[in-house]
Amino acid sequence: MTDQSHQCVIIGISGASASGKSLISSTLYRELRDQVGDQHIGVISEDSYYKDQSHLTMEERVKTNYDHPSSMDHSLLIKHLQMLKSGQAIEVPQYSYVEHTRKQETVHIELKKVIILEGILLLTDARLRNEMNFSIFVDTPLDICLLRRMRRDVNERGRSMDSVMEQYQKTVRPMFLQFIEPSKQYADIIVPRGGKNRIAIDILKAKISQFFE
């Protein structure tokens, strides 16, 4: 059993790509950090744990299906969560969507009372679910997610609208229907309407605040 002084609460936030997961995660982090201090709460993105592809050619890397569970290094993520729970610091990998592989640098994270973990495939892995104290699924209509994703990938990741649409049709939507949507059944809380659902955010804040008492 984990020593009381080293307890780290893991809260999983999942949902479709561009559903509002990151907005909810960042809002919760920012508002709770202002209450308790950043030494007590942190955020980890599942995106940081895409598998290293430095051994592949660029031609091979660009074919990666980022919406399939096999693209994730969940074993490393689970190891890192267990390290945090045992009081150890971790080095979170960083991923380059331009190079389609991990960067050289990492982000150092010390033990926190609460870690907010966000990502599209979190609830698809039973091992990962077992590491969470509770989980949230952000339930946003796919057409809204597509519009948000197109804006994000064109503006922030330098992609063309045609390539974003092609990826959506070939992998994003099929993988959502095959893996992500079915994982909703494992969520403890379902949040409709994405990251601007203020009532849901306030309820989640109240729930998470209990872990700081």
From Swiss-Prot:
Protein keywords: ATP-binding, Cytoplasm, Kinase, Nucleotide-binding, Transferase
Binding-site positions, ATP: G15, A16, S17, A18, S19, G20, K21, S22
Keyword Cytoplasm: yes
Localization of this protein: Cytoplasm
Recorded name of the encoding gene: udk
Protein source organism: Pectobacterium atrosepticum (strain SCRI 1043 / ATCC BAA-672) (Erwinia carotovora subsp. atroseptica)
Pfam families recorded: PRK
Entry annotated with the keyword Nucleotide-binding: yes
Domain of life: Bacteria
Listed EC numbers: 2.7.1.48
BP terms from Gene Ontology: CTP salvage; UMP salvage
GO cellular component: cytoplasm
Sequence similarity: Belongs to the uridine kinase family.
Protein name: Uridine kinase
Molecular function GO labels: ATP binding; cytidine kinase activity; uridine kinase activity
Reaction(s) catalysed (UniProt annotation): uridine + ATP = UMP + ADP + H(+); cytidine + ATP = CMP + ADP + H(+)
Enzyme class at the top of the EC tree: transferase
Classification via NCBIfam families: PRK05480.1 (NF004018), udk (TIGR00235)
